[in-house]
Amino acid sequence: IEDVTRRAAKAGYLAIAPNALSPLGGTPANEDEARTKFQELKAEDNLKNFIKVFDYLPLRKDSNGKYGCVGFCWGGAMSNNLAVNVPALKAAVAFYGRQPAVEEVVKIKAAVQLHYAGLDERVNAGIPAYEEALKKNDIPYELHMYEGVNHAFHNDTAPTRYNEVAAKLAWQRTIEFFNEHLK
């Protein structure tokens, strides 16, 4: 996540990576322990903590007032939920994230970009209903399916899942999307 934040900053954006596990004492160095900690989070409280970032951003002198978010896996679901719950959001990018409840989609004011892994049947099962709701509510969106790759294809620290070609294309699309909606 820190590397993705660095990449967004290098692309010219004010980039902030909230630590979802801060209320539980921070992120353990051991990834298995960190995954276990995520199970302890209360979804509603966690969403409120992430929304507070958007209360903070207007206070920064280096903010242009146009806000976006990007998330991966659990963070992809968070990006979708932020799109529903932060009216000031202009662009939300979700990588292989669980979709919001269909009845909540009407609240989205941001343009949405979605990246999915072709082999990710669990997450992909929610795509048809989400896409239908986006269309029904005239929400601008892009949906990109990367065939033949697994969930977490953008995670270059997971060699069994990382797919360099798909990851580079998805990141290029993300920055282009941000350039279109946040500059």
Language model features by range: what are they?
Residues 1-59, 155-157:
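Serine-hydrolase catalytic machinery in alpha/beta-hydrolase-like enzymes
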Residues 4, 124-134:
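Short alpha-helix in the alpha/beta-hydrolase fold that links the catalytic acid
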Residues 61-72:
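Alpha/beta-hydrolase fold nucleophile elbow
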Residues 71-75, 79:
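Gly/Ala-rich beta-loop-alpha elbow adjacent to hydrolase catalytic centers
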Residues 88-98:
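A conserved short beta-strand
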Residues 108, 114-116:
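Short beta-strand/loop motif that positions the catalytic acidic residue
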Residues 119-124, 151:
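Acidic catalytic loop of the alpha/beta-hydrolase fold
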Residues 135-183:
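C-terminal catalytic histidine-bearing segment of alpha/beta-hydrolase fold enzymes
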